[in-house]
């Protein structure tokens, strides 16, 4: 029952603060086992919860993070869960202080009657998937979705992981490889 994502009700009782006391633990809601038969969703759970663990401070209460984890398990039941996941990751980054406000940093360009967004850095011009800038989570084009995940991975790497000497989480790499299949 100790699966990532299961909700528990934990009650601690002791006669006084100096005594060990006892714990009463009950499973409140089983979530992860619902997805054991889906390799992509299971990999997504491991990757996402690993990201939460990596980005949050241990033993610090954060109700907003708790709420979006609940939202995560709700949209995972939907058919278009993968496009919602990108916006969930952006919200997680925002809650931990790494807001990626794409609308304010992109430049718009029209090529062959198609609107494209890009960001220019010192050494490259990186195209941003339109649905991320326009905040349209009803996207069906898998290539755009995958490019969105790669963009978030690059942002994670350059802004959070490398400055703190943390390697890219293996669970995320495995998840990206799983959804590519």
Give residue spans per PLM region.
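Non-catalytic alpha-helical scaffolds and adjoining flexible linkers that form interface surfaces
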Residues: 1-181
């Amino acid at each position: 029952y100790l699966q990532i994502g299961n909700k528990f009700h934990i009650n601690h009782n002791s006669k006084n603060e100096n005594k060990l006391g006892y714990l009463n633990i009950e499973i409140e809601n089983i979530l992860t086992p619902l997805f054991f038969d889906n390799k992509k969703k299971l990999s997504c759970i491991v990757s996402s919860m690993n990201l939460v663990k990596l980005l949050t401070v241990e033993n610090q209460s954060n109700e907003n993070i708790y709420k979006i984890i609940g939202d995560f398990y709700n949209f995972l039941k939907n058919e278009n869960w993968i496009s919602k996941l990108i916006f969930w990751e952006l919200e997680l980054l925002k809650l931990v202080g790494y807001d990626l406000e794409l609308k304010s940093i992109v430049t718009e360009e029209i090529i062959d009657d198609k609107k494209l967004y890009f960001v220019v850095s010192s050494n490259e011009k990186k195209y941003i998937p339109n649905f991320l800038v326009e905040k349209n989570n009803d996207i069906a084009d898998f290539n755009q979705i995958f490019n969105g995940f790669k963009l978030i991975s690059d942002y994670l790497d350059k802004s959070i992981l490398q400055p703190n000497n943390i390697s890219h989480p293996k669970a995320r790499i495995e998840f990206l490889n799983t959804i590519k299949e």
